[in-house]
Amino acid sequence: MTVLLDTNVLVALLVADHVHHEAAETWFAHIDRRFATCPITEGGLVRILIRQGQPAESVSSVMSAVSSHPGHEFWPDDLPYRVIPMTGVIGHRQVTDAYLAQLARTRGGRLATFDQGLAKLHDDVADLVPTKG
């Protein structure tokens, strides 16, 4: 089974000074499955890296490294929003969460997140990545 990394987990894995970097690395080292990214999560990573001041060329290298990892799968964002269950969505920030959860369901995978609310709302498909503290 493949696990889709939400943007925060993806960023935490790749940004050494992220508050959850160590927790993400520990979790990732112990999962025994492939991992996936999609345009939404990759776009989030690109935005954050550029906002932190990384040059676009450097960001492109990071994205190439992620996609060339032997355990990586790329999942296209190919679901129309009309098929996304909106049960429990009460705010605009939960729309992307609902999309990622449905993408994982559709692909027969899981969704890894640090977001307790997302994990609770989509407990059928979301795994809460443990943090220290």
Describe the residue ranges of each PLM region.
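Short, well-structured N-terminal submotif of metal-dependent ribonuclease cores
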Residues: M1-T37, L49-S61, K132-G133
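Active-site neighborhoods of divalent-metal-dependent phosphate/nucleic-acid chemistry enzymes
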Residues: H69-Q116
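Conserved beta-strand segments of alpha/beta enzyme cores
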Residues: R34, G71-E73, V125-D127
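Charged phosphate-binding loop/patch that engages nucleotide di/tri-phosphates or the phosphate backbone
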Residues: T106, R110-G133
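Short, conserved alpha-helical segments within structured domains
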Residues: T41-E42
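Short glycine-/acidic-enriched loop or helix-start segments at secondary-structure transitions
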Residues: V15, I84-M86, L121-D124
